[in-house]
């Protein structure tokens, strides 16, 4: 029986981290977690990490698509924060970011890790950006690396 399972060490992986500027005080913590995980755990070289900033989470899918189409990256990590407010805006932005990033992954056949927080309030966002609920940016980065390795194994099998 053959079992394929990716590891998180990917020293030669080229990774784009796409980060929304809106809610930057949260997103910068996600970015710090992602970069730390890529370098320290994934052993990705500094020169193989590209950071791209978008205005907000809604713009993440288009930028991720362009990066995927460039064929310069093995994986993309998308980071952002969408916090529910008093209008339907939350549903539109969160839904489009989620479905758009998923579409990029499927269409381009490249791992696109979803590190976009979709929370009810600021407290939940802070908890998920490096306090008691961990750092979802770091988790997304490690997911991206594991998927890079898993896809390589599938292609070689």
From Swiss-Prot:
**Any S-S bridges, and between which cysteines?**
none
Coiled coil stretches, renumbered: none
Question: Is Transferase one of the keywords UniProt gives this record?
Answer: yes
The EC designation for this entry is 2.5.1.78
Question: What residues form the catalytic site here?
Answer: 89 (proton donor)
Task: Specify the pathway.
Answer: Cofactor biosynthesis; riboflavin biosynthesis; riboflavin from 2-hydroxy-3-oxobutyl phosphate and 5-amino-6-(D-ribitylamino)uracil: step 1/2
SUPFAM superfamilies tied to this protein: Lumazine synthase
Binding residues for 5-amino-6-(D-ribitylamino)uracil, per the UniProt record?
A: 22, 57-59, 81-83, 114
Query: Which UniProt keywords are present, listed alphabetically?
Result: Riboflavin biosynthesis, Transferase
One GO biological process term: riboflavin biosynthetic process
Q: Which residues bind (2S)-2-hydroxy-3-oxobutyl phosphate?
A: 86-87, 128
Q: What is the main EC category here? A: transferase
Concerning InterPro entries, the annotation shows: LS, LS/RS, LS/RS_sf
Catalytic activity reported: (2S)-2-hydroxy-3-oxobutyl phosphate + 5-amino-6-(D-ribitylamino)uracil = 6,7-dimethyl-8-(1-D-ribityl)lumazine + phosphate + 2 H2O + H(+)
Q: Which GO terms describe its cellular component?
A: cytoplasm; cytosol; riboflavin synthase complex
* One MF annotation (Gene Ontology) recorded for this entry: 6,7-dimethyl-8-ribityllumazine synthase activity
Quaternary state and partners of this protein? Forms an icosahedral capsid composed of 60 subunits, arranged as a dodecamer of pentamers.
This chain's function reads:
Catalyzes the formation of 6,7-dimethyl-8-ribityllumazine by condensation of 5-amino-6-(D-ribitylamino)uracil with 3,4-dihydroxy-2-butanone 4-phosphate. This is the penultimate step in the biosynthesis of riboflavin.
The record's section on NCBIfam families has:
lumazine-synth (TIGR00114), PRK00061.1-4 (NF000812)
What family name appears in the similarity comment? Answer: Belongs to the DMRL synthase family.
Annotated protein name in UniProt: 6,7-dimethyl-8-ribityllumazine synthase
Task: Name the source organism.
Answer: Haemophilus influenzae (strain ATCC 51907 / DSM 11121 / KW20 / Rd)
